[in-house]
Amino acid sequence: GGSVLYYAHKKGLSMVHVFDACAPGLMLAYGIGRIGCQLSGDGDWGMPNNNEIPAIISFLPDWMWSFDYFGNISGVDLGAPGRPVMSDGYMYEGNAWPTPFYETVMAFIIAGILWFSRKKIKVPGVILSMYLVFNGVERFFIEKIRINNNYNMFGLEATQAQIIAVAMVVFGLLGIWYFIKKAKKEATA
């Protein structure tokens, strides 16, 4: 990231344009990173889900609904009462929501939306702001089925990621408003 900023500054490029150009790639990279989370089973998964796949989506592979994270290095109990964590810290049974897979799919969709919007949206800064909104909304809702600590803020329960996601959405919406207002002002000047 720093090298991109340094290069852009050295070449006199507008940072807003650089951020807009980077937004689709950031979302794509996030999705690729989540593939690693899914494959490694590193504890970045959802809550226990030992339910049968609903008939309406039974055409999908079972692992898209409920996944057995064989590499449960966190030793999280995935919902089988009385099942011990192995002495090596791994748990070899129990299924969970495959949230890294869901995030991969959403990240690729968002990256596609940002990529195909880049030529239609002419206002600098709006693509970056859209990235913040879409990524924040995606992360907020995926946290609803993920294992994480909740914090009590102003009487509301939220995970750290949800708090950050709300901030991303707020800053993204403010950014869209600001950049469009700025472009209109410059157009009339």
Where are these regions (language model features)?
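A feature for loop-to-transmembrane-helix boundaries and adjacent hydrophobic helices
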Residues: G1-A189
